[in-house]
Amino acid sequence: MSDRHEDGSGATAAQDTQDAHAAHDAQDAVEQAWHGVVATARRTAAEGLVVGTSGNVSARVGDLVLVTPSGVPYDRLGPGDTVAVDLEGRQVLGELTPTSELPLHLAVYRNSDAAAVVHTHAVHATAVSTLVPEVPLVHYAAAMLGGPVRTAAYARYGTQELADNMLGALRDRTGCLLRNHGTVTYGSTLDEAYDRTAQLEWMCRLWLTASSVPGHSPSLLTRAQLEEVQDALKGYGQPG
């Protein structure tokens, strides 16, 4: 009897240790993700993609979504300000109120394999959102976002209607414009999501610049040319 009891105690102790390690790893993952969210949000401000407390950034860790809070300057956020919700939007970490654009972020995570979302009010992209239903193919960088970038119909910020409009524009894409509002991009990492935002803003600036020359219209790529680039991009970057 004593041997069986000791064996059971040993198994229980081993399981407790394993659970403790798993909990520690999960906590580390959350802390690292929050650090990345804050760093990326600060980067959007530093590089002029947002003004003040506008825009928002999120990252997914398992069934948790870590997201910037509403109305708090990014340079004031620290390790103790973690804000996290579940995929239904219920807050599970932190005391600060999540961003008002939470429906937008959750819609992306529920309908894609995204691990990060970046939303900005980048000035050139927002300007283009007021002009066209789709960003003209002025550069092959559009391939990095899955194809010609669409403009989602306008709806008030923070609404499910806006989130639904965004999903339509994101079909087979990793980024879109929000009419009279800004940009949304997502990726498998925060760096990838941010890079797609930067590429989108740059393309919009390029098109506005080329379009402003009197008496000339920018030459545009064909869909076939863009598809050729998409094929070439499959081998882009470092292996592994």
State each model region's role:
Residues 2-12, 16-240:
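Glycine-rich flexible loops
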